[in-house]
């Protein structure tokens, strides 16, 4: 899969998930994609490659629970820790808990993320001539 295709899909999924957070007045609304730090973008591109890539059927998370577990591991690997109040600078996140302990809105957000990845996988394609 082209890196450009992965980037297109990543931006689509990220921005759509961000809009969902805004629309539902979520307690944490991600900053714009352009403002995300490089380690986050790198791990997010890996998630999108796994969820949407050519061989994604064998690798992708198929349930919100599975996706959340992968997300937690990625955040722990980037040095984030659990804390009740979100702090991007200190890498503290209240959602670093088992899926069953998440508020309903956060569990729903993971289900929407899987749906957005499926939309990106099926509908975001490179033009015939590429970029």
What is the meaning of each model-derived region?
Residues 1-131:
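Alpha-helical propensity feature that highlights long, continuous alpha-helices across diverse contexts
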């Amino acid at each position: 899969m082209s890196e450009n295709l992965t980037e297109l899909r990543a931006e689509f999924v990220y921005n759509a998930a961000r809009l969902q957070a805004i629309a539902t007045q979520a307690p944490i609304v991600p900053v714009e994609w352009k403002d995300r730090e490089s380690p986050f973008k790198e791990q997010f591109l890996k998630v999108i490659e796994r969820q949407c890539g050519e061989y994604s059927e064998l690798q992708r998370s198929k349930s919100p629970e599975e996706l959340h577990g992968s997300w937690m591991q990625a955040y722990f690997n980037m040095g984030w820790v659990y804390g009740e109040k979100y702090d991007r600078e200190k890498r503290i996140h209240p959602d670093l808990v088992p899926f069953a302990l998440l508020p309903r809105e956060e569990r729903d957000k993971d289900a929407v993320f899987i749906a957005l990845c499926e939309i990106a996988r099926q509908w975001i394609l490179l033009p015939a001539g590429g970029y």
